[in-house]
Design a protein with these regions (language model features):
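Hydrophobic alpha-helical transmembrane segments of multi-pass integral membrane proteins
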Residues: 1-17, 38, 92-103, 120-125, ...
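Residues that define the loop-to-transmembrane-helix transition and helix capping
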Residues: 1-2, 34, 61, 87, ...
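Hydrophobic/aromatic residues within transmembrane alpha-helices
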Residues: 3, 7, 54, 80-82, ...
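Alpha-helical transmembrane segments of compact multi-pass small-molecule transporters, enriched
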Residues: 9-14, 66-80, 95, 159-163, ...
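Hydrophobic transmembrane alpha-helices of multi-pass small-molecule transport proteins
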Residues: 15, 37, 86-109, 130, ...
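Specific transmembrane alpha-helical segments of multi-pass solute transporters/efflux pumps
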Residues: 20-67, 103, 194-212
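Hydrophobic/small/kink-forming positions within alpha-helical transmembrane segments
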Residues: 40-45, 49, 71-76, 131-134, ...
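Intrinsic disorder in cytosolic terminal tails and internal cytosolic loops
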Residues: 263-274
């Protein structure tokens, strides 16, 4: 929790000069403030907290592949809340992806007793982290037509830092010596998380979201789990099980069908939210 706090606290500080230079141009409507706070709570506080807590309990391979369900949640939530179009093939893909997620989460292994409760709970937390991210993106979408991507990014960083300050303080008082254990390599890692993983990544996502739909914006994140899986095997020495491969194939096909369907092929199978 302390790492999350430091990450977004320093990211907020880095963005402070921009806000100071643009403060006369930035006019926030009072009615939008609760929405911006909600984006920060869902997209940062809940998303990252749930993901890291889940990662403590499960493998990096399972966590990375389960995060691939994010585009499928984007399809459902984008259709339901933003009235984005959805087709029959999308629903079929979501169903396949859901089955794949159940396999990786460990539903079959529960009945055979080959998965621990801790790992199962960790996998559930990873799924909840994806849902939290999509909810944040759904709330942010209409706000990006009013405010610049950098403004939205800066505000949610501040929200993330504030909401993580209390658990970070508790963690520090329980183990005040942890800061003395930070190495030079650790400082480089924190700098990377602040400048690239936080400021650059969140800004580019919010900017991309302002130019396209929630579905398309989240679609590009499906490359990440496959890269993470390869690194987990090479660096962490984790093993890929047969059930993981089966679930991963189902999710990959599900994401493809759920998000990459061509309008001209499926125009007769269109669904609309009433």
């Amino acid at each position: 929790m302390s790492l999350i706090f430091l990450r977004f606290a320093f990211a907020s500080i880095f963005l402070l000069p921009f806000f100071m230079s643009q403060k006369k141009k930035i006019k926030l409507a009072k009615k939008d403030l609760p929405k911006l706070i909600a984006v920060g709570v869902f997209a940062i506080t809940l998303n990252i907290s749930l993901f890291f807590e889940g990662l403590k309990r499960t493998t990096a391979i399972d966590a990375s592949m389960l995060s691939l369900t994010l585009p499928m949640f984007s399809v459902l939530f984008g259709w339901w809340f933003l009235k984005e179009k959805i087709y029959f093939v999308n629903l079929a893909g979501i169903f396949l992806g859901f089955l794949g997620a159940l396999v990786i989460i460990g539903i079959p292994q529960i009945f055979t007793g080959t998965i621990s409760r801790e790992a199962f709970f960790g996998n559930i937390l990873i799924i909840l982290a994806s849902i939290a991210w999509v909810i944040g993106a759904i709330i942010a979408k209409p706000l990006l037509s009013k405010y610049s991507s950098l403004v939205v990014t800066g505000i949610i960083f501040v929200v993330g830092a504030i909401t993580m300050s209390l658990p970070s303080a508790v963690e520090y008082f329980n183990n005040p010596a942890w800061m003395n254990q930070i190495t030079i390599l650790g400082l480089f890692g924190l700098t990377y998380m602040i400048l690239l993983s936080s400021i650059s990544a969140y800004f580019l996502f919010e900017w991309g979201l302002s130019k396209t739909s929630v579905i398309v914006a989240d679609l590009f994140q499906y490359i990440e789990p496959f890269v993470a899986t390869v690194l987990a095997v090479l660096i962490l020495g984790e093993r890929i099980s047969h059930s993981f491969l089966f679930g991963a194939v189902l999710i990959a096909i599900g994401v493809f069908m759920g998000t990459l369907a061509k309008k001209e092929i499926h125009h007769r199978s269109r669904f609309h939210k009433h």
